[in-house]
Structures are given as C-alpha cells and as structure tokens.
C-alpha cells in the first residue's frame, strides 16, 4: 500500500482521479506549471504563489481540483479502516464534531458517521467542479462572482478530512509508510489556503500544534 501511494503522489498513474484537466486548455497549462514547480524541489511557500500575469481564479480552480483529487485519494487508501463502527460521528478528536448540511437531503446540520460524511462530501465537491456554471472550462467564460466563496467552502470541508485522518487514523498513515507523503500534501494545502486566506483561522485550530511543528 505504501508503494502504491508513493507511486500515486509521484506520477498520478495508479489511480483514476475524479476530475482531470483537458489538454490544450489554459487550466491544463497552469496545472502542468504547478506540478513542475512541485517536482522542482522549490519551497512549498513559493510554489503556491500566483505566477505573474495569471488570473487568480484560474489558479485557485486548478488547486482546488488538484487538492480534491489528492485528498480523495488519501482518504480512499484508509477508508476500510474508517467504518460506521470505528467512526460513528464525523469528528476531529473529542473537541470537534462536524455536521453535514446541503441543499438537498440534509437542509439542517446532521450528525453523520465519518464514512457517510466523506461520501457526501466527495460527491458534493465533484458535482461543483463538474458544473460549468461554477467551474467554467470554456475560454472566455467568466467565473461566477461568488467563486472564491464556493472554493472557501470546498477547502474548509477538505481541511476537515485532514483533521479526521490525522487525529483518528494516524496509525494507518504510519502503517502504510505514507506519513511523508501525507505531510507534504498537507503542507502544500496549508500554505495555499494561507496564501489566499481561503479558510478561516478558527477552522485550522484542531491541527494547530501539528501545523506549527511541520509548517515552520
């Protein structure tokens, strides 16, 4: 499993991401630029900065999709250890509980098991990034005015996946030999959301001590 995860983070060939960028599009070129910077060994704080002359919404869109794919993968590798029995509530330790709310089935905040919450979350995000009105892919079609607010909600909920995985399934990360890869993904995610102020500081509190240790 560790080898599989290592290969995935290296070349994205051992799994099928839920969303790809179309070759030949501006966003595909931005994605390639971002990936090249990651592989070059540059400091992650530098990697997340908006390249000169690029549109900030395009840059955010590329990263939201990439983080969705990677975090979906991280959770997927340990999903069998996150069950209705082991994780009856979506939580981040004893102090933090996350309830699910959407515009369809759960109009009021609902207490759900972690696997149920994760399934709804990934489907919800996939629906948004495949919605042309939210994440337009055609040249010349502008992003909606509330695009960054939508991305804030997506990234806030994805951060909660990190919270749950680190606090409740860190032993699984260690047993798979995946700690370095998950930490790198987290640091990349953290520097990005801080660079563009996309997640409220209060949401980051559950992992504050760990973040201070690995994101120094």
UniProtKB/Swiss-Prot annotation:
What is stated as this protein's family in its record? Belongs to the MOB1/phocein family.
Q: Which SMART domains match?
A: Mob1_phocein
Q: Which GO terms describe its molecular function?
A: metal ion binding; protein kinase activator activity
What is the protein named? Answer: MOB kinase activator 3C
Alphabetically, which GO biological process terms does the record hold? signal transduction
All disulfide bonds of the chain are: none
Q: Which SUPFAM superfamilies match?
A: Mob1/phocein
Q: Name one GO cellular component term.
A: cytoplasm
Alphabetically list the UniProt keywords: Metal-binding, Zinc
| UniProt: Zn(2+) binding residues | 82, 87, 164, 169
- What is the recorded function of this protein according to its Swiss-Prot or TrEMBL entry? May regulate the activity of kinases.
